[in-house]
């Protein structure tokens, strides 16, 4: 049996939710990942260091006995975030980044920034304190085609932003286009990007294969095959600017399977197995460890993990559903076979 032992990975973009939903999904991430950058888009959002401390405590309290996991907290950037809050975040040691959502761009983003140019004083404070800015890189202008929103964001907002704040550490999260890859490659080392398993494995055809498939719908939306190929090449290139971030986003089945369903793919259950399949498809399994375990902590200036996980070449069937409050949770590629399996973690 072929086996692959890796330094224990981290997830640099994760949605854990709260309450009973948190308790349902946290064990899946903790089984594979030592740490995760936890998204702040709760209701209400995590806007202050005090909010982040409370949420962190709830995450740790929900962790099952015998599992270890370190939540790395983030603040939700709003039009009203203050430079003083940025200083408090740096002093806290447990807040590791600030997240930018354009208002209305994705789940629970109603409190997001209405005009990114209004946040320059915050970006200046973040540059001064050396706190990374995490970007949901899409415009929300309804006149812009949904498949072009990332490209237009880069052209309209991101290029000017990094020009104004050249020392600001920036992560362009869940990149989906060749334009995003090109942008990251042509910027300084303080600019990085996360890539999800779904964007490495699927093009937008997956959403419409034989009908509408809501469990492949996420934001930013899956793109053309040429973009998937560009992402796969970037992820497997050995370039440290690209690292793992699942954007695993749990929604109950009835929230996805309806006339106006939520955006988000749930991959925390089997994330490393999905990434292994993607890297194997590019004959690049030797590049998986650095992508999953080294480049993220290096970017965040944190130590690499010392423990390991082992994946084996073993076929198993992804469950149709996993327990979750309400109507259950459908994982990405539910009911299908996958060819890698975590043996310990």
Curated annotation (Swiss-Prot):
Record's keyword terms, sorted: Hydrolase, Metal-binding, Pyrimidine biosynthesis, Zinc
Domain of life: Bacteria
InterPro entries (UniProt xref): Amidohydro-rel, DHOdimr, Dihydroorotase_CS, Metal_Hydrolase
EC number: 3.5.2.3
CDD domains registered for this protein in UniProt: DHOase
Cofactor binding summary note: Binds 2 Zn(2+) ions per subunit.
Binding residues annotated for Zn(2+) 2, in chain numbering: 99, 136, 174
GO biological process annotation, one example: 'de novo' UMP biosynthetic process
Enzyme class at the top of the EC tree: hydrolase
Described purpose of this protein according to its UniProt entry: Catalyzes the reversible cyclization of carbamoyl aspartate to dihydroorotate.
Protein name as it appears in the record: Dihydroorotase
Taxonomy of the source species: Bacteria, Bacillati, Cyanobacteriota, Cyanophyceae, Acaryochloridales
């Amino acid at each position: 049996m072929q086996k692959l032992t890796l330094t224990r990975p981290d997830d640099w973009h994760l949605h854990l939710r709260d309450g009973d939903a948190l308790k349902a999904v946290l064990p899946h991430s903790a089984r594979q990942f030592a740490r995760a950058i936890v998204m702040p888009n709760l209701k209400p959002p995590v806007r202050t260091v005090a909010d982040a401390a409370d949420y962190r405590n709830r995450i740790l309290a929900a962790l099952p006995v015998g599992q270890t996991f370190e939540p790395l907290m983030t603040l939700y950037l709003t039009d009203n975030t203050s430079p003083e809050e940025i200083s408090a975040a740096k002093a806290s040691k447990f807040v590791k980044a600030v997240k930018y959502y354009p208002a209305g761009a994705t789940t629970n983003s109603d409190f997001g920034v209405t005009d990114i140019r209004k946040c320059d004083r915050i970006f200046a404070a973040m540059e001064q304190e050396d706190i990374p800015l995490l970007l949901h890189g899409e415009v929300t202008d309804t006149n812009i085609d949904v498949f072009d929103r990332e490209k237009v964001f880069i052209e309209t907002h991101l290029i000017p932003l990094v020009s104004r704040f050249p020392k600001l550490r920036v992560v362009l999260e869940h990149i989906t286009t060749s334009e995003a890859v090109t942008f990251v490659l042509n910027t300084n080392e303080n600019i990085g990007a996360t890539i999800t398993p779904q964007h490495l494995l699927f093009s937008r055809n997956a959403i419409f294969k034989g009908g509408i498939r809501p469990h492949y719908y996420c934001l930013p939306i899956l793109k053309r095959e040429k973009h998937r190929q560009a992402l796969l090449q970037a992820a497997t290139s050995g370039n440290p600017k690209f690292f793992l971030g699942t954007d695993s986003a749990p929604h109950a089945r009835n929230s996805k399977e309806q006339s106006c369903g939520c955006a988000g793919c749930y991959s925390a259950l089997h994330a490393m197995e999905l990434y292994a399949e993607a890297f194997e498809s590019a004959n690049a399994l030797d590049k998986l460890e650095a992508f999953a375990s080294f480049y993220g902590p290096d970017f965040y200036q944190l130590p690499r993990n010392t423990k390991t996980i082992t994946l084996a070449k073993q076929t198993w069937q992804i469950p149709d559903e996993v327990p979750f409050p309400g109507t259950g949770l459908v994982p990405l590629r539910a009911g299908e076979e996958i060819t890698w399996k975590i043996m310990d973690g």
